[in-house]
Each structure stands twice: as structure tokens, then as C-alpha cells.
Amino acid sequence: MNLEHNFNLPNYINHHLHHLQLNLSNLKFLNFNDNYIRNFWVCNFDSIFLSIFLGLVILISFFKISKTFTIQTPNKIQICIELIIDFINNNVKEIYHGKNKLIAPLSLTIFVWIFLMNLMDLIPIDLVPFIFQNFFETQIPIKLVPTTDVNITISMSLVVFLLIIFYSIKIKGIKGFLKDLFLQPFHNPIFFVFNFILESISLLSKPVSLGLRLFGNMYAGEMIFILISGLLPWWLQWILSVPWAIFHILIISLQSFIFMVLTIVYLSMASTKH
């Protein structure tokens, strides 16, 4: 289903790759043409709203489910959640070598939250534009997958980066943290500057690679869905979109798992004294 009577593939792709943006200077939404204007005081409202909304869904759902937990007659939802928790606990025990009660809950939150954000990619590409076009008589650019927004993925990885710095200083102390920067990998004072440059690059590359890996994989997956929708008529799209959607479920789960595991690994490295 196309958004314009005279279908144009570049315009179709461009429309689906734009965000619903809010101008913070006047608190007004930008229309599709305004999205070409680059402004520092503009935020991707769709990504922020959906990220917060899905986070609240997780909190409320887990809170309500926790009230119904029972040992005698567990329901299917409880069994599923227990399997997820056991899976994450086992990964934390195998990877994280310190003692920290925050790591397991943090890993659970990261895994479930990213999984739900990635899962939005399975919603049909044209569904929301179709609803707005036919019921509200307006065309708005909107992206339903928060993890295809580099601002979201980098923001999450920066939180992990701050935790790395925090636990490095907390466990090793300021002196130990500075030793890691200036005395690794070479202990000779001659290499202080070289060590600092090398370790700084290594430290800063962690959040960058963590955020860009998630963004790149999810963005590429969305691009394939858009190309399938744009190049094929609606009655042929299922031939490619259904197999790709099934395969994409694996990508969705895998990217959530990779982000979680790398977070545990980085925090374990930060908590280990040399």
C-alpha cells in the first residue's frame, strides 16, 4: 500500500526512514518536508516515546505478574519468566566474576527492554502511515523501532559506559583506575603516554561499538522490510516478508542477547583487579 497516488520508491523509502520530530524551541511537531531541516533543538519524539512506553510496559507487567507468582501452581507466564530469569542468572554467574546484586537485574532489564524495542520491527511498515492517512487525513513520518535510532542505542551504551567508570573507581579506587590507564599494557614509565592513549581508545570504543552494533543490525533489517514493501505489490510481499520476518525474530533475540552479554563482560572487566 503506497502513501502517494504516483508511487515513487525513493520518496517512499525516505518517508519511512524519517522520524516524528519535535522542535523543542516551540514544542511543535515538524511535518514531513520540515524533516529535511537540521536543527540541534529537535528530538526524535517517536523513539523517545516508544522507548519510555515499552519500559513502562515492562515495569507494570513484571509488577503485576510478581503479585500472582505461586510455587504450587505456576501458570505459563510465570514459567516463561522463570526460564528467562534462570537463563540470565546463569549467564551472569558464568561471565561476571565479582559479587554485585545489581548485575542480574540490570541484565534482565537490558535484555527484555531491547527485545521489546526490536520486536516493534515486526509491525507492518505501512500500518501506522495508513492509519494516519485514512483516519486523520495526514501523513506523518514515524519509526516504530527505537533501536533503529542511533540516539537511543548510543544513549543506552553511554549508561553502560558510566557504570563501567563507576565500578572501576568504586572497586579499584581512583589510584587503581589511573593505574589501569597509565600502566597497562606496559608497566615501564616511558610508555605512560602511549598506555594512556591506547587504554583511552579501548575504553571509549566500548560504548561506541556497543551502540553502533545494535543500531546497524536493526537498521539494516528495517531497510530490507522497507525495500520488500516498496518494490513488490502487496499480494507478493508475503513471499519475501514472511521468511524474512521469521529469520528476523532470530536477529531480534540475538541482538538483545549480545548487548546484554557485552554489558556483563565490560562490567566484569571493570570490576576485576589486575
From Swiss-Prot:
Q: How does it assemble?
A: F-type ATPases have 2 components, CF(1) - the catalytic core - and CF(0) - the membrane proton channel. CF(1) has five subunits: alpha(3), beta(3), gamma(1), delta(1), epsilon(1). CF(0) has three main subunits: a(1), b(2) and c(9-12). The alpha and beta chains form an alternating ring which encloses part of the gamma chain. CF(1) is attached to CF(0) by a central stalk formed by the gamma and epsilon chains, while a peripheral stalk is formed by the delta and b chains.
How is this protein situated with respect to the membrane? Multi-pass membrane protein
What are the record keywords, sorted?
A: ATP synthesis, Cell membrane, CF(0), Hydrogen ion transport, Ion transport, Membrane, Transmembrane, Transmembrane helix, Transport
Instruction: Give the matching SUPFAM superfamilies.
Output: F1F0 ATP synthase subunit A (SSF81336)
Q: What is this protein called?
A: ATP synthase subunit a
User: Which Gene3D superfamilies does the record cross-reference, listed alphabetically?
Assistant: ATP synthase, F0 complex, subunit A
Per UniProt, subcellular location reads as: Cell membrane
Q: Which family does it belong to?
A: Belongs to the ATPase A chain family.
Q: What does this protein do?
A: Key component of the proton channel; it plays a direct role in the translocation of protons across the membrane.
Which parts pass through the membrane? Answer: 40-60, 110-130, 149-169, 224-244, 245-265
Q: Which Pfam families match?
A: ATP-synt_A
> Organism, per UniProt?
Buchnera aphidicola subsp. Baizongia pistaciae (strain Bp)
